[in-house]
Amino acid sequence: MTKVIDENIQRQLDKKVSFFVKYFPARIQNVGEDAKAARQLVWAFKDSRDSAYEEVAQMTAKHLKEEYGEKVKSMVLVCVPTSKKENYQSRYMMFCNRVSELTGIGNGFSHVCVLQDRLDVHNHRRGKKKTERQAQLIDLDTYYFKDKEICVFDDVVTTGKSYADFANKLEDSGAHVLGGMFLGKTYYRYNRQ
C-alpha cells in the first residue's frame, strides 16, 4: 500500500535536511556502542542535562558554517516547539544562544511562544492505532520572521511531520525556510559493521 503524504509536508521534506546521529529508540536493544552513545546524547539533550546542549551546539555550529559559510550571519535559527512550554525553554534557550554565539546566526528562540501544551508524539500512539494529533497553539513574531531565511532545528526526526508543520507555519508568517537540521534521525534496524 502506498503511503500518501500531504503535499505541504512533502514540500518541506524536499528541502535540505540533515542529521548528526542515528537514533535507535530504547526498544531497539541489539545495537552497538556507537548507537548507545548517540542514544545517551539525544536523551541528555532532550532532558537538558550534562551540558549536552554545548556538544550539540558545537555540532550544529560546525554544520551551519560548512553548509552556509558567511551567509549564516544573515539567517535565523528556530527550534521546533516541544510538547510542553517549560521543556521548550529548558531544552532550547541556552542551545540557541550558544549556536548564535558560535556562528553569528540570528537567534529566533525568543520569537516563538508556546501558548498551550499538547500530548507529545509518543503519547498519540495506542498499539497500532494512532489517536488524532492535536494542533499546538504557538505564537510567532510575524514581524520578526517576515522575509528572514530560516534554518529549523529539532532534536529527533522520525516522519518529519512536526518539522514540516512548524516550517509551514513559519512560511505562513512570511519567512523563507531553507531546511531542517536534527540531532538524530530515528532508525529501527542496526547494521553492524
List each model region and its residues.
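PRPP-dependent phosphoribosyltransferase catalytic core
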Residues: 2-11, 164-193
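Short, well-ordered alpha-helices that flank and scaffold nucleotide-derived cofactor binding pockets
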Residues: 62, 97, 101, 168, ...
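Short beta-strand-loop/turn "lid" adjacent to the catalytic site in phosphate-handling enzymes
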Residues: 76-91
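Active-site-facing substrate-recognition patch
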Residues: 1-72, 76, 113-146, 185-186
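Charged helix-capping and loop-helix junction motifs
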Residues: 91-97
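Long C-terminal interaction/binding lobes of large macromolecular proteins
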Residues: 140-141, 148-151, 165-170
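Short catalytic/ligand-binding loop motif for oxyanion handling, primarily in non-cytosolic enzymes
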Residues: 85-89, 118-120, 188-189
